[in-house]
């Protein structure tokens, strides 16, 4: 037994001339790895301006190749988190977001495609956000971050460090506690889409709306209280 319940394989989100190895040629390898094991295999694909053109091909080929295998879970589409130059060069347009929505809605294998909370903005379904609650990301620096989307972002607080603090201490830290507290109600509550969207991705809102301030708590509250930068309304 592998001692694991799931293995996630990240699919290349861009192709270079040097990349000539395809995951689809390695099915026998995966069959051997998961033989007589209860673990599942999932795939991650980050959707950005660079990878958008290959999205439909990647999703269809991955699902078609692995859906008959009992160990296959789903292919998860990860929403690109824009930082720095990526804010203008790699972020998706509203038209591209609609294309992603239609790709999912028109698929006959929806059960094999995972969108997740950051895609609630598409208005398809609500996946409850578990930031700072059911999820804790430990970085290489030992710091516990509330979500992958704001990993290594420390301008609004730090929960603690695994080298010095217990998981419970970091979960109950002021930073994590404030995120959970502020993520209950916000300015989008009156919107007809709110029951599905829930104002979008908290990590995306923090990255997009953060401004330097001495009052980190109020800044955090303002960011969480804002609309998702890719609001589809």
Which residues does each predicted region cover?
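Flexible mid-to-C-terminal extensions adjoining Fe-S/redox cofactors in radical SAM and related proteins
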Residues: 149-233
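Radical SAM enzyme [4Fe-4S]-AdoMet core and its adjacent flexible, acidic
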Residues: 2-145, 149-165
């Amino acid at each position: 037994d592998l001692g694991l319940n799931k293995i996630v394989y990240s699919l290349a989100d861009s192709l270079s001339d040097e990349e000539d190895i395809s995951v689809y040629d390695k099915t026998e390898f995966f069959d051997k790895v998961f033989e007589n094991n209860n673990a599942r295999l999932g795939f991650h694909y980050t959707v950005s301006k660079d990878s958008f053109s290959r999205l439909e091909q990647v999703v269809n080929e991955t699902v078609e190749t692995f859906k008959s295998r009992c160990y296959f879970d789903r292919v998860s589409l990860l929403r690109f988190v824009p930082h720095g130059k990526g804010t203008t060069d790699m972020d998706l347009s509203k038209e591209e977001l609609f294309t992603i929505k239609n790709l999912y809605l028109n698929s006959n294998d929806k059960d094999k495609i995972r969108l997740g909370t950051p895609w609630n903005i598409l208005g398809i379904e609500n996946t409850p956000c578990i930031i700072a609650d059911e999820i804790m990301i430990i970085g290489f620096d030992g710091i516990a971050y509330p979500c992958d989307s704001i990993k290594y972002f420390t301008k609004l607080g730090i929960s603690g460090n695994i080298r010095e603090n217990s998981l419970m201490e970091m979960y109950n830290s002021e930073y994590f506690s404030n995120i959970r507290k502020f993520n209950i109600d916000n300015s989008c509550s009156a919107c007809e889409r709110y029951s599905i969207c829930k104002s979008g991705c908290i990590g995306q809102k923090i990255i997009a709306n953060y401004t330097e301030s001495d009052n980190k708590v109020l800044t955090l509250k303002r960011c969480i209280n804002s609309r998702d930068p890719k609001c589809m309304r």
